Regions:
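Catalytic-site signature segments of enzymes, centered on catalytic residues
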Residues: 149-226, 256, 260
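Active-site SXXK
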Residues: 54, 60, 82-113, 186-194, ...
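Sec-dependent N-terminal signal peptides of Gram-positive bacterial secreted proteins and lipoproteins
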Residues: 2-26
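Short, gly/Ser/Thr-rich active-site loops of penicillin-recognizing serine hydrolases
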Residues: 346-371
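Short, Gly/Ser/Thr-enriched beta-strand-loop segments that form substrate-interacting elements
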Residues: 293-332, 339-344
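Active-site helix/loop module of the DD-peptidase/beta-lactamase fold
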Residues: 84-87, 102-147, 195-234
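Short, conserved catalytic-motif segment at the N-terminal edge
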Residues: 37-83, 105, 109
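Penicillin-binding protein/beta-lactamase superfamily catalytic region
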Residues: 224-296
């Protein structure tokens, strides 16, 4: 019996030793893969003359790779550097609208994707034919070509929304159901959030998104603490990096409530996207509704595009007059993909997505969309 007991103890010791060795071996492999990816991404960014920060997600693990400078004397990747997300904010606004749809069920403030926006905008011409779903899918027929032109005025939230309503009443409108990608739709949605809650968009954003997820590097323009630095944007020109430095003016961004005021980092934005449909921000059923609205006419729905038969999702954002660009593409389960926030480029949307696609191909061959 004593010998048998010793054998059992020896076997147990061997099992424990083996169990201890396997994770260490796996950790070594994972570290090697991470180092390989970091080298690959940095070399690619250098070759393509882009600077910024990219979150690379592999099997649910996030690795942030940064290259170049945020401004003179400050590198991308520093803890205090944040970036304009441009149109990537639209998904945030859509998520808050969906939260309110779910919360207000059974109350006098209940609304659905089919509710006409004349409830909140009785003075807007044609509002009795436009639904909340039309705004979320850019099928309202509304657009203002000059919506992103800096008017040189620092608008309050209400002032930005009211300007849009007044301008729309002066402009020609296409039939409801016509697809026009326009900030107008999401500015009106921001106004609805204000009217339904009786609180500012900023207050809702902080409560419903930032505080709920514990995001520490995510703000709206005008609300960025002094210790954080919004990266400057640059062009690559005449074989030189960091040319034509540009920032986005606060007056211009104040016009774009709900559409393009977001300041964040790739890792924080990934935290937001990956929380959708988990119960942290939206229940799975609410998230499914968010991505399958009846008014959807293209692959765009609620702030992003759904492609490859629902296997991947993506969005791109940029504002003219500066060199920033933001882009993400993730698998539907959020386990693999990238979030890019770029502050130097000399290429347009298609070429930047092409750079991203090279990273995506290294992650998961032939899984992601090229466009």
């Amino acid at each position: 019996m004593a010998k048998l007991g010793k054998k059992i103890l020896v076997l147990l010791a061997l099992v424990i030793l083996c169990l201890g060795m396997l994770p260490a071996h796996q950790v070594g492999k994972d570290r090697a893969k991470a180092a390989d990816m970091q080298t690959f991404v940095k070399k690619l960014m250098k070759k393509k003359r882009i600077a910024g920060s990219i979150a690379v997600v592999h099997n649910g693990t996030v690795q942030v790779v940064s290259y170049g400078r945020a401004k003179k004397g400050l590198k991308n990747g520093a803890k205090n550097v944040v970036y304009p997300a441009a149109s990537l904010q639209k998904q945030v606004t859509a998520a808050m609208v969906m939260q309110l749809m779910a919360e207000k069920q059974g109350s006098s403030k209940f609304f659905s994707q089919n509710t006409k926006i004349s409830r909140w905008y009785p003075g807007l011409r044609g509002a009795s034919k436009i639904t909340v779903g039309n705004l979320l899918t850019h099928t309202s027929g509304l657009q203002i070509p000059e919506i992103e032109v800096d008017r040189g005025v620092t608008y309050s939230e209400a002032g930005a929304v009211n300007w849009v309503v007044n301008r729309l009443n002066q402009a020609s409108q296409d039939a409801v159901g016509t697809y026009h990608y326009s900030d107008v739709n999401y500015i009106l949605l921001a106004g609805i959030i204000r009217k339904v809650t009786g609180k500012s968009y900023a207050a809702n954003f902080k409560k419903r998104i930032v505080n709920r997820l514990g995001l520490r590097h995510t703000f709206l323009i005008g609300k960025v603490p002094a210790k954080y630095q919004v990266a400057a944007s640059y062009d690559y020109q005449n074989s030189k990096n960091y040319q034509n430095r540009r920032y986005l003016s606060k007056t211009r961004l104040s016009q774009l409530i709900g559409a393009a005021q977001l300041i964040t980092t790739p890792s924080d934005y990934y935290e937001f996207v990956s929380a959708l449909g988990t119960g942290q921000l939206l229940a799975p059923s609410t998230y499914r509704l968010m991505t399958h609205l009846k008014s959807k006419k293209t692959r765009y729905c609620s702030g992003f595009y759904i492609k490859k038969g629902g296997k991947v999702k993506l969005a791109y954002g940029a504002l003219g007059g500066a060199h920033y660009a933001s882009y993400y593409q993730l698998t539907s389960d959020n386990q693999n993909g990238i979030v890019m926030m770029i502050n130097q480029r000399s290429c347009g949307e298609d070429k930047l997505k092409g750079i991203g696609y090279q990273i995506l191909q290294k992650l998961e061959l032939n899984t992601f969309s090229q466009t």
